Amino acid sequence: MLREYKTVREIVGPLMLVEKVEGVKYNELVEIETGSGEIRRGQVLEVNGDKALVQLFEGSTGLNINDCKVRFVGKSIELGVSIDMLGRVFDGLGRPRDKGPMIIPEKRLDINGNPINPTARDYPSEFIQTGISAIDGLNTLVRGQKLPIFSGSGLPHAQLAAQIARQAKVLGTDSKFAVVFAAMGITFEEADYFISDFRRTGAIDRTVLFINLANDPAIERIATPRMALTCAEFLAYEKEMHVLVIMTDMTNYCEALREVSAARKEVPGRRGYPGYLYTDLATIYERAGRIKGRKGSITQIPILTMPEDDKTHPIPDLTGYITEGQIILSRDLYRKGIYPPIDVLPSLSRLKDKGIGQGKTREDHADLMNQLFASYARGKQAKELAVILGEAALSDTDKLYAKFADEFEARYVAQREDEDRSIEETLAIGWDLLTILPRAELKRVRDEYIDKYLPEKGE
């Protein structure tokens, strides 16, 4: 039986205080009926004695405390899930945005998910091919990993996200692959780009999109990634699919969290963000992984824009603590016209060693990766030295390394937006680049691999 109250004390911004309530639970779903009969939804944020603080999803515009009816539903927010969600576009609360019919749910799941017993987790160890050399070759993505992309305002992270969503695949398995795409606080233009790109390339058929626009309520933005992950958990653990969850932009999510925290008059932490920002982000990122005995898996690629390109900002800083590495986009590479502008030196995939090698990619992958990384770093140093002292001060070997760095950026890092490179193509480009350097400089690659894979100069 629903409990209905007309005891609204005050409404401030997206918050409503209801008095004289009984048996109300934290996170409980709330329905608010306006004087005109319109139904709005909210969620219980806090309970103190007989008072409940309710957060409104659709905002408080037009509400009158004298004629509002508040009903506490007795359950938390749930998402109706079904395999039919593939190919559909939803808003941040799981309602159809593509003018299609409502989904007939196979079951309804709490969007906060169930915690995974750490002993039930399986270690990520299978290679996911994104078709992007800078990721596949040097910062390999592994099934069940959470690997964020740190971008900056104006950088092409939207195009990169769409490209990964189109191209990602698990090699050597017959399991189905799906993409769940959650967009938070994006513009109409960006939303149209994602939807039209997926439809044009046919990727929409294996994708579920949850889109929260910049003019949608902040509280809806907080629910969006949880809706997406609930859908992903259903597809992974009930339908045995490999699911890649791409979430953009986590900075907008954290801004919404700060906005709601300020409305609740909570004590702010660093730069005004709530003190529980780390814990809140962990409840999202830790829903990635694999479970023993289950075929499905959830791999996460959260994307965030670093305010003022600052890696020490609380959002990238805390994200880096929780996730297993980071891929950093470079403004300098972007100015050179290189797409994707992935800066491979500060980028890192902590699980890359587990997803490469014989039977996964190729036996020479680890050695080649180490050699390319070291050679590019040496080439960057040589170029910096040339700026200070002039090219005449460089040794012949340093000049070769400087040439290697330029070629590496132009041929290995750079690729077309529609270019889907196989791991064999990526490795072949890497070996071809090493022909620029003398064989004596290839100290990180075993001789048998050099004999087997290094092309002759001039081939």
UniProtKB/Swiss-Prot annotation:
Belongs to the ATPase alpha/beta chains family. GO terms for biological process: proton motive force-driven plasma membrane ATP synthesis. Coiled coil: none annotated. Keywords: ATP synthesis, Hydrogen ion transport, Ion transport, Transport. SUPFAM superfamilies: P-loop containing nucleoside triphosphate hydrolases (SSF52540). Transmembrane segments: none annotated. Pfam families: ATP-synt_ab, ATP-synt_ab_N, ATP-synt_VA_C. The keyword Ion transport applies. GO terms for molecular function: ATP binding; proton-transporting ATP synthase activity, rotational mechanism. This is V-type ATP synthase beta chain. PANTHER family: V-TYPE PROTON ATPASE SUBUNIT B. Produces ATP from ADP in the presence of a proton gradient across the membrane. The V-type beta chain is a regulatory subunit. The lineage of its organism: Bacteria, Bacillati, Bacillota, Clostridia, Thermoanaerobacterales. It comes from the Bacteria.
